[in-house]
């Protein structure tokens, strides 16, 4: 739209998350949103409802959180959570942020029918890893109503099947938090990605295939959440809390 013109595009984000633990986004979620905006050509990034947002989870550290939003260079090495947009419990908030634009999630899983979900990130993880800066990269899916021991899944990232030795499953069936029951009936499939499986800058694709479904269960399985979590070291060979005794 702005090619060969003097116009610039400014990206913006709201501060409504409406998840089970946090109504407002955390710093890592905002940093990821801003990084994606810059990566797609935005000249600046802002929060469009900052004035009336009095319950932000980062108010106590506001300067440290807001400062990186002004520059893609400052954002390059900060921790991020790239969360695929979903439909919040309150549908009037429009999970995409734009009325009329359908959120990507949730998606239903049917046996033998793959679901492809776009996941956009801005980080050049291979470059940062060559500098020794990458601490951990995790791909996380929250699956609803699915019992891992009774159902077989195949999960791929950019056409590479993620092996089970990278997988850790967390059962949320009976998990309570101060806000109440946390995602009852859900399982978190978390892959701690090796460098060969790192997502690339730009659009990536996560494909989830239900290979075999428990024949004794007549209930819809869903992909409820999908995110990529990235943590960095301040510099090579640096750990924040290395002394254990």
Regions picked out by a protein language model, each given a short descriptive name:
Residues 139-141:
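Amphipathic protein-protein interaction modules
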Residues 1-116, 121-131, 146-151, 155-158, ...:
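Glycan-processing catalytic domains of CAZymes
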Residues 135-137:
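Structural beta-strand segments of beta-rich domains
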Residues 238-245:
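Acidic, serine/threonine- and proline-rich intrinsically disordered appendage/tail regions
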Residues 144-238:
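Beta-strand-rich ligand-recognition modules
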């Amino acid at each position: 739209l702005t090619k060969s013109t003097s116009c610039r595009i400014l990206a913006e984000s709201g501060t409504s998350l409406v998840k089970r633990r946090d109504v407002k986004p955390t710093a890592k979620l905002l940093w990821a949103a801003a990084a994606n905006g810059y990566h797609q050509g935005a000249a600046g990034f802002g929060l469009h409802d900052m004035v009336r947002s009095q319950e932000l989870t980062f108010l106590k550290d506001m300067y440290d959180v807001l400062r990186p939003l002004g520059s893609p260079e400052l954002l390059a090495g900060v921790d991020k959570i790239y969360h695929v947009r979903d439909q919040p419990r309150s549908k009037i908030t429009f999970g995409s942020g734009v009325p009329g634009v359908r959120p990507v999630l949730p998606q239903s899983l049917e046996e033998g029918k793959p679901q492809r979900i776009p996941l956009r990130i801005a980080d050049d993880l291979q470059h940062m890893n060559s500098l020794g800066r990458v601490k951990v990269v995790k791909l996380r899916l929250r699956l609803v109503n699915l019992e891992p021991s009774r159902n077989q899944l195949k999960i791929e990232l950019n056409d590479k099947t993620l092996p089970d030795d990278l997988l850790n499953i967390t059962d949320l069936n009976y998990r309570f938090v101060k806000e109440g029951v946390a995602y009852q009936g859900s399982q978190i499939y978390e892959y701690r990605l090796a460098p060969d499986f790192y997502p690339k800058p730009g659009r990536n694709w996560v494909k989830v295939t239900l290979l075999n479904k428990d024949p004794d269960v007549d209930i819809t399985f869903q992909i409820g959440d999908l995110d990529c979590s990235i943590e960095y070291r301040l510099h090579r060979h640096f750990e924040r809390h290395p002394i254990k005794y």
